[in-house]
From Swiss-Prot:
This is Conotoxin VnMLCL-01. GO terms for molecular function: toxin activity. Expressed by the venom duct. The mature peptide does not contain cysteine residue. Residues 20-43 form a propeptide. Keywords: Amidation, Cleavage on pair of basic residues, Neurotoxin, Secreted, Signal, Toxin. Residues 1-19 form the signal peptide.
Amino acid sequence: MLCLPVFIILLLLASPAAPNPLQTRIQSNLIRAGPEDANMKTDKRVIISGLLSSILVPLVNAIKG
């Protein structure tokens, strides 16, 4: 009878230690995709800011006279 509680305790201790393969795969994909996504966001920001500045600067200059 002593073996059953010991077995249950060992099972509870071992289960969180085992990595979830799906979670590990998703985490590795996110780590790999992180820098690429950051570069894409930066490129989009540069393009958008360039477009806005090319539109807004002439408008502001026209308003100032």
